[in-house]
From Swiss-Prot:
Coiled coil stretches, renumbered: none
Pfam family, one: Methyltransf_4
Name of the molecule in the record: tRNA (guanine-N(7)-)-methyltransferase
Record organism: Anopheles gambiae
Major subcellular location class: nucleus
């Protein structure tokens, strides 16, 4: 039976939500965030799901292309997109709302919040709660003085190890070779993570989707740019 689609509901247009490519993660933005993971009100974000835990987190989810793909690929898993830019996060929230209205019963398992994951990740997730963490096309922060702002660094990796369950995975994708090498070096040096061989990484069901389902990935494809992917297991 064909899926019923409500064509009267229109998807938001990105041109009305444009914002600069990156945001300063150290700036004193104003965010509402739970003091403890137990105080996270997931029912507001997933009103038709019931009492289930978020297990996938897309950090810096951008315009939500990969987040939507996650929802389609794993309909029984809850995924959250975390985005620091206000207009971009507004777009993703409006996009998910429209998708839910257009496709009754679908996309109930994805949501987006505006937050600074570099500061507040442990406020949202319990120890070993997550199965997968995604870092797709993060800000490269090219200047050496700003490398400490990169989303992959030794301090934050310990937080990622805390919220990821043993056997969980970190996924990274970038079109910047130097950043790819930086991320791989720091994750491999952390005692809680081990990189999957490229042959195993290519067999992951998400491998092709990681490269092309996000808006940034599609932009890199249009520009004929290189893409570098790596997957790491939580030991």
């Amino acid at each position: 039976m064909e899926e019923a689609i409500d064509d009267h509901v229109k998807l938001p247009q990105k041109r009305f939500y444009r914002q600069r490519a990156h945001s300063n993660p150290i700036a004193d933005h104003s965010f509402d965030y739970p003091l403890l993971p137990e105080l996270s009100n997931w029912n507001e974000l997933y009103p038709n799901i019931g009492n289930r835990q978020v297990v996938f987190a897309d950090i810096g989810c951008g315009y939500g292309g990969f987040l939507v793909t996650l929802g389609e690929t794993f309909p029984d898993k809850l995924a959250i997109g975390m985005e620091i830019r206000v207009k971009v996060s507004d777009y993703v929230m409006d996009r998910i709302k429209a998708l839910r209205q257009r496709h009754k019963g679908k996309y109930e398992n994805i949501a987006c919040i505006r937050t600074n994951a570099m500061k507040y990740l442990p406020n949202y997730f319990r120890k070993h709660q997550l199965e997968k963490l995604f870092f797709l096309y993060p800000d490269p922060h090219f200047k050496k003085a700003k490398h400490k702002w990169r989303i992959i660094n030794p301090t934050l990796l310990s937080e990622y190890a805390y919220v990821l369950r043993p056997g969980g995975k970190i996924y990274t994708v970038t079109d910047v070779r130097e950043l790819h090498e930086w991320m791989c070096k720091h994750i491999e040096e952390h005692p809680c993570f081990k990189r999957l061989p490229d042959t195993e990484a290519q067999e992951d069901i998400l491998a092709p989707k990681l490269l092309d389902s996000s808006e940034e990935g599609q932009k890199v494809t249009r520009m004929s740019g290189e893409k570098f992917m790596a997957i790491f297991t939580r030991l």
